[in-house]
Regions:
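Intrinsic disorder in cytosolic terminal tails and internal cytosolic loops
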Residues: 177-214
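Intracellular juxtamembrane helix-capping segments at the cytosolic ends
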Residues: 109-122
Length: 214
């Protein structure tokens, strides 16, 4: 399921980087410099939005449990799909750029939220799981490219991709964890908190001992 969700976020990102500049030139009459700046803003979102997706997933998991990670991913991908539909129907440059930045924010956060789930799928095969999910991004980009060739219109391709992403967001809800898995992860989390508390206590006691000796 995470293979599909990553195809719907990172795969779309790769596709957008490949066609968005020419889309702005052909549809809105922008020059290459303006189109490049618009697409560059989309790419710059990755500098912080991915981390935001991962951190939001961590915070929700601390408050509402492991299943909330999957629900967050579903919500981000759903908003991404809505943003793609908005982008494809935009009639002006300003509206198109706004829509692209909006769905781009959700897209990059979805990438981070996807990989926030990776360690909890199978700890014994963490590298394999990460590799398979990562491959989903490349498959998604290739599939989007073939879809664009089949449809012929980039604008209509974005519309169809928006629908696919909305449908793909349901795959995030299909990510389930057994009760034993949730209990095990909760125990690991509590043990990590306890170890962190003990480490901080030792550091404080060491500092106080050093100050008293001086």
């Amino acid at each position: 399921m995470l293979f599909v969700t990553y195809a719907g976020c990172f795969g779309i990102e790769l596709f957008v980087h490949g066609v968005a500049a020419s889309y702005y030139v052909d549809r809105f009459g922008l020059d290459l410099r303006g189109a490049g700046l618009a697409v560059g803003g989309f790419g710059l979102l990755a500098l912080f939005a991915r981390a935001m997706g991962g951190m939001a997933s961590d915070r929700l998991a601390r408050r509402h449990g492991l299943a909330s990670r999957a629900r967050l991913l579903c919500a981000l991908m759903f908003c991404e799909g809505i943003g793609l539909l908005w982008f494809s129907s935009a009639q002006g440059v300003a509206m198109a750029v706004t829509a692209m930045l909006a769905f781009g924010m959700c897209l990059h956060m979805a990438c981070g939220a996807t990989y926030a789930l990776v360690p909890f799928v199978d700890r014994k095969a963490l590298g394999g799981v990460a590799g398979i999910i990562g491959a989903g991004g490349n498959v998604g980009a290739v599939a989007a490219g073939f879809l664009q060739k089949y449809i012929g219109s980039v604008q209509h391709t974005f519309t169809v991709l928006g629908g696919f992403v909305i449908a793909g967001s349901l795959c995030a809800l299909a990510v389930r964890f057994s009760r034993e898995h949730v209990t095990s992860e909760e125990r690991r989390y509590q043990e990590a908190l306890q170890q962190n508390w003990l480490l901080q206590s030792r550091e404080l006691s060491t500092d106080s001992t050093g100050r008293s000796s001086t």
